[in-house]
Amino acid sequence: MLFRSGFVADLLIPGHGMPIVGAERVRQALTDTAEWLETLVSQTLALMNAGATLEEVLRSVKPPARLAERRYLQPVYDEPDYVVRNLWRLYGGWYDGVPSHLKPAPAAELGREILALAGGLDGLIARARALAALGRLALAGHLIDWAVAAEPDHREVHAARAEIYERRAAEARALMTRGIFSATARESRSEEHTSELQSQ
């Protein structure tokens, strides 16, 4: 619609990324971006209408490969799954399809139960570190977050959490993802230092 009205721009300065110069390149970038977003919307809605959970939608929705390769559509700031999460909220609300999330137990209680199942804090920390060593950083993050929820003042928990999230930040492509993981690691380094001072 924008281009049918005769609008032509020679320069596009996006919110994230490098400027795009030249009327044809600007037109291509805007058209590709619109198509990229439309495919995420249509895939998300189709899966939601089929009864998929948020996790299933997040694992299934992918931008078209030919568009995902475009330089201006690289996940530099955020990532496609963040767009999908926002589409889920827009069209489906906050409920993610997991019944226990409807009225969840407090994180500290859940963390303590996970600790009990793992045989204690040392076992959970060790397993999180072992998973991280295998490159399974997302799963390691879940385990260490449960450990922090259960024992928020424990020095070794924060040391492990910082290690895991520093690795996650180093592997992240998107600025938003890297920023959140880096902030988490810094927070735990600070907590680790505070716990060490308090124990002296």
Predicted features and spans:
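Divalent-metal (often Zn2+) His-rich catalytic cores of metallo-beta-lactamase-fold enzymes
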Residues: 3-56, 60-95, 167
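TPR-adjacent "capping" and linker segments in tetratricopeptide-repeat scaffold/adaptor proteins
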Residues: 32, 99-123
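TPR-repeat structural position
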Residues: 54, 137-138, 171
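Short, small-residue-biased leader/transition segments that mark boundaries at the very start
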Residues: 1-2, 192-199
